[in-house]
A protein has these predicted regions:
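Helix C-cap/helix->beta junction micro-motif
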Residues: 30, 140, 195-196, 318, ...
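Conserved glycine-rich beta-strand-loop-beta hairpin in the small C-terminal domain of fold type I
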Residues: 282, 286, 301-312, 322-335, ...
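PLP-dependent enzyme catalytic core of the Aspartate aminotransferase-like
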Residues: 86, 94, 124, 338, ...
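Hydrophobic residues in well-ordered beta-strands that form the structural core
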Residues: 125, 146, 202, 356-358
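N-terminal small-domain helix-loop-helix segment of the aminotransferase-like
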Residues: 2-104, 112, 288-291, 394-395
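Conserved core of the PLP fold type I
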Residues: 66-193, 207-222
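Conserved core segment of the aminotransferase class I/II
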Residues: 222-302, 309, 313, 393
């Protein structure tokens, strides 16, 4: 039989696996040292109480003849889709219920949606980039081109009219850089996509962290986006569902290519290859949009925002350049002393006992930069910030 040869084209290991191996080796050599992890973007605050109650209630339902649920609708239960619809409407964005598809998280849909598009399409991704965008397309054999970003453009790449792309990845606020596009900047991307008959895959996983009014929470706030964009979002960062797994994808009715309606194609794909998210999980997700749910998750988001400010304030005090941290849980900093990314990783671990993520692991344009996250414990984040500040000042 023949294997998919493109898997052999992937990098030898995943970035966070390399980090884990380095940290394990250091911990084994220095068992007495406390290591503070500000690397991988997993949340640490527990699920909201009303979310847990909704899960309990749904589990109890499943234990009764009257309340038992077997296979659900592949595209999601109406109660959750209507709650999401209301969430968009509350921000002035109109989305039809049948444009919303419930998933087990953004990462799955970011990969699965590619099945609708031919492997001959050219893909445009930013550099630095969330590695999954690249790996998903490498394994399909697509041509990938990079939109290079830098400190000079605030790590926000803009379209190059000399470049033709068919699939465009945008993540705003961005992972890993924390940078976020304004509405005017997103309009330029939408116009570019429409001109090139391209489709934007818009990763909105971090929209919940946006506080500035001039930043879009959804690509569909931008005129023309319904004709060229698919939005993918999740409850992982907004509601702490990294271990619970639930997300959603919005595919507008207007989105068509080569005479095929992509909303209908995605529905057909889901009914063929996906059996839906568990009823208990969808009930938990719906609780997020209740009055008490929104209040509780905002409390958790504020917790992470305070962590971000603690890190940012420490970097400000020692004169280190960074972006992100305000509308994002990620702080993307210039490595002090002209250190390379992995050099700074080793230095930070040795001198501060702090783990972050080397920027070069996200692409060539990340060399010399480093990502810290605000998802840690508050007290440990304060301790890490003090250690980092003192160590950098001593350089």
């Amino acid at each position: 039989m023949k294997m998919n040869k493109h898997y052999s084209e992937l990098k030898a290991s995943y970035l966070f696996v390399d980090i884990a191996h380095k940290v394990a080796a250091y911990q084994e050599a220095h068992p007495e040292k406390e290591i503070i992890r500000l690397g991988i973007g997993d949340v640490t605050q527990p699920l909201a109480k009303c979310v847990v109650k909704a899960m309990h209630d749904a589990a109890d339902e499943m234990g009764t003849k009257e309340g038992f649920h077997g296979y659900g609708p592949e595209q999601g239960y109406p109660f959750l889709k209507q709650a999401i619809q209301g969430y968009y409407a509350g921000r002035g964005t109109k989305i039809a219920e049948d444009e919303i598809f419930i998933s087990d998280g953004a990462k799955s849909d970011l990969a699965n949606v590619l099945g609708l598009f031919d492997v001959d399409n050219t893909v445009l991704v930013p550099d630095p980039v969330y590695p999954t965008y690249v790996d998903d397309n490498v394994t399909d054999g697509r041509k990938i081109i990079y939109s290079r970003t830098s400190q000079e453009n605030g790590f926000l790449g803009m379209p190059d009219e000399n470049v033709k792309a068919d699939i465009i990845y945008i993540c705003s606020p961005n992972n890993p850089t924390g940078a976020a596009y304004t509405r005017d900047q997103l309009k330029v991307w939408v116009d570019y996509a429409r001109k090139n008959n391209a489709i934007i895959l818009y990763d909105a996983a971090y929209e919940c962290f946006i506080s500035d009014g001039d930043l879009a929470r959804s690509i569909f706030e931008i005129e023309g986006a319904r004709e060229c964009a698919i939005e993918i979002c999740a409850f992982s960062k907004s509601a702490g569902f990294t271990g619970t797994r639930c997300g959603y994808t919005v595919v507008p009715h207007e989105l068509e290519r080569e005479g095929m309606n992509i909303n209908k194609l995605w529905l057909r794909r889901q009914t063929t290859k996906f059996n839906g998210v568990p009823y208990v999980v969808q009930r938990a997700a719906a609780a997020v949009f209740t009055e008490s749910g929104m209040a509780e998750i905002q409390s958790n988001l504020d917790y992470y925002r305070r962590n971000a400010k603690v890190i940012a304030d420490a970097l400000d005090e020692c004169g280190v350049w960074y972006c992100g941290g305000k509308n994002s849980p990620y702080i993307w900093l210039r490595c002090p002393g002209n250190m390379k990314s992995w050099e700074f990783f080793d230095w930070l671990l040795e001198n501060c006992g702090v783990v972050g993520t080397p920027g070069v692991g996200f692409g060539e344009c990340g060399e010399g930069y480093f990502r810290l996250t605000a998802f840690g414990d508050a007290e440990k984040t304060k301790l890490a910030a003090e250690r980092i500040k003192d160590a950098i000042k001593a350089l």
